[in-house]
UniProtKB/Swiss-Prot annotation:
Matches recorded under InterPro entries: DENR/SUI1_TIF, DENR_C, DENR_eukaryotes, DENR_N, SUI1, SUI1_dom_sf
UniProt name for this protein: Translation machinery-associated protein 22
Organism: Debaryomyces hansenii (strain ATCC 36239 / CBS 767 / BCRC 21394 / JCM 1990 / NBRC 0083 / IGC 2968)
GO cellular component, one term: ribosome
Signal peptide per UniProt: none
DNA repair is among the record's keywords: no
Length: 189
């Protein structure tokens, strides 16, 4: 018997579909650009003038126009959605709050990272190992995740978060440090 070998299938890095199915996704224009840069021979096979003429020869002119209008609308919606997400990310800010526990003990609370699709548990674990302290993920008063790190490592945490945001090409995001002190109780009369 002959051995059956598995097929090697290329996947689009933009939409994660095989390139033949990119046209059914919402990011077709970006998929097409990626395919032209990375797989020029497959691009020619799928989107050359001859291939497009063969594929559309069975469609009537009205149907073809209707389909192209629908695709343009979907692409415009997808681009607008991506633009809104980017604006939301750029307008948000990360807050690092230094909270005094006792006289010389501090914890820092890091909030505002949930917008950036960062896994909070992994980041807390990274902080715990990087700064040799305890770190956990809790919900704050607004029911949003925040990372609590024991110890006064706010400067180091700020540097690390800024570096993390730079890797995601979000240099304009503000990382704000706040120093919160406990209110002293008035002495008993």
């Amino acid at each position: 018997m002959t051995e059956v070998l598995p097929k090697n299938i290329e996947y689009c890095e933009v939409c994660t579909f095989p390139p033949e199915y990119c046209e059914f996704g919402l990011s077709f224009k970006r998929c097409k650009e990626w395919l032209q840069e990375n797989q020029p021979e497959l691009f020619e096979k799928l989107y050359s003038a001859d291939a497009l003429a063969n594929a559309t020869s069975t469609l009537s002119l009205e149907k073809e126009q209707k389909i192209s209008q629908e695709m343009e609308k979907k692409q415009a919606k997808e681009e607008a959605k991506l633009e809104r997400e980017l604006q939301k990310k750029l307008s948000s800010k990360v807050t690092i709050k230094r909270i005094e526990r006792n006289k010389r003990k501090h914890v820092i609370s890091i909030s505002g990272l949930e917008v950036f699709n960062i896994d909070m548990k992994k980041l807390a674990k990274t902080f715990a190992s990087k700064f040799a302290t305890g770190a956990s993920v809790t919900k704050n008063a607004e029911k949003k995740d925040e990372i609590i790190v024991q110890g006064d490592v706010s400067d180091e945490a700020k540097d690390y978060i800024e570096k993390l945001l730079q890797e995601k090409a979000l240099d304009e995001v503000k990382v704000e440090q706040i120093d919160e002190k406990k209110k002293k109780k008035p002495p008993a009369p």
